[in-house]
Amino acid sequence: MTIIVTGGAGFIGSNFVFHMLNKYPDYRIVCLDCLTYAGNLSTLEPVMDNPNFRFVKESITDRDAVYKLFEEEHPDMVVNFAAESHVDRSIENPQVFLDTNIIGTSVLMDACRKYGIKRYHQVSTDEVYGDLPLDRPDLFFHEDTPIHTSSPYSSSKAAADLLVLAYYRTYGLPVTISRCSNNYGPYHFPEKLIPLMIANALNDKPLPVYGTGENVRDWLYVEDHCKAIDLIIHNGRVGEVYNVGGHNEKTNLEIVKIICKELNKPESLITFVGDRKGHDMRYAIDPTKIHNELGWLPETKFEDGIKKTIKWYLDNREWWETIISGEYQNYYEKMYANR
């Protein structure tokens, strides 16, 4: 079995690469990643010498490069993690999100059509559903919840999802889609909430929280997500969407306070900043379908997952300290200064 994993040098993609090589030692995993700011080749060092692993530095938007890789590897499956994924960056520069998330997906779809594939899996997000009101905790996103996007990022992911389903209906391409809640865990790029707060707290820097911090997110430990995708690509029904959630709803402010407590840092570091444009209020996923059909349930309680995540960042300071220098530092100053 040969699987092309696009975006495999990023956060969720790299964790998926590790999961698959560990669970299926006979599988060949080919990582296709153009190494944007969020892709880090050092993340993949533990598997670089594995004879069943190959890394290819190319963009999914490069049709010639993608076709060449398909001709060389004859993949059985493609799992597409490659995406621009940070909402704030999509507000600043939407075009790169349209290029990667929509055009890149179309290139992969065409390659799958041209060369044949047993399964194409699109890794998507619950953000395509929009948001839920804070005063309705009984409401959850289901697979048939209408798409109602709020940001250029979520709009680009929704467009890609629709394209994937169109290729299934029009061309009979064997596709599946997963829509997940917010992931956390090792190798998470430090622009996102949890790693940003861990890094800042360790350096006794302000902890910037948008608005009042009341926005609610459902948190999913990345290894649980990888196990869900593993089940979907092997046993999921073709043409179906599966919601993958963690049953760990927390306000952003709760998350930051938990991190302060775990690191023994004062809550006085918390600094409220101007809210994000179009900030979604609440995300909450109902994963009943994937549980009923594939037997998946999230295994990691948030209290345990956040401890493991913090320990990883304490044990791997060099990894994230290298990242938060240079381009990221310029971006951070732009996003949080004078707000």
Locations of regions flagged by a protein language model:
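Residues that form or flank phosphate/diphosphate-binding pockets in enzymes
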Residues: 12, 38-39, 64, 188, ...
